[in-house]
């Protein structure tokens, strides 16, 4: 099977797309997982909506000392 792709998943801290608080990436080559990446990210001003926390379980305390998206993007 020649199935190759990358799947990307973002979790957000608020209802705004620029509030990423986590990113996960999986690369599949010829139907096999060949690479995985996951990182928590500090969203702007470390602001979270309670409804979003209930969905993914990520809290402000978990990201308060982490870099923002622009710092991890080169990875």
Language model region names:
Residues 1-75:
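Conserved non-catalytic scaffold segment of RNase H-like nuclease domains
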């Amino acid at each position: 099977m020649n199935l190759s792709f990358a799947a990307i998943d973002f979790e957000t801290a608020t209802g705004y797309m620029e509030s990423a608080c986590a990113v996960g990436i999986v690369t599949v080559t010829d139907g096999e997982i060949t690479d995985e990446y996951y990182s928590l990210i500090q969203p702007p001003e470390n602001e979270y909506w309670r409804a979003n926390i209930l969905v993914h379980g990520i809290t402000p305390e978990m990201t308060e000392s982490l870099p923002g998206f622009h710092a991890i993007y080169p990875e």
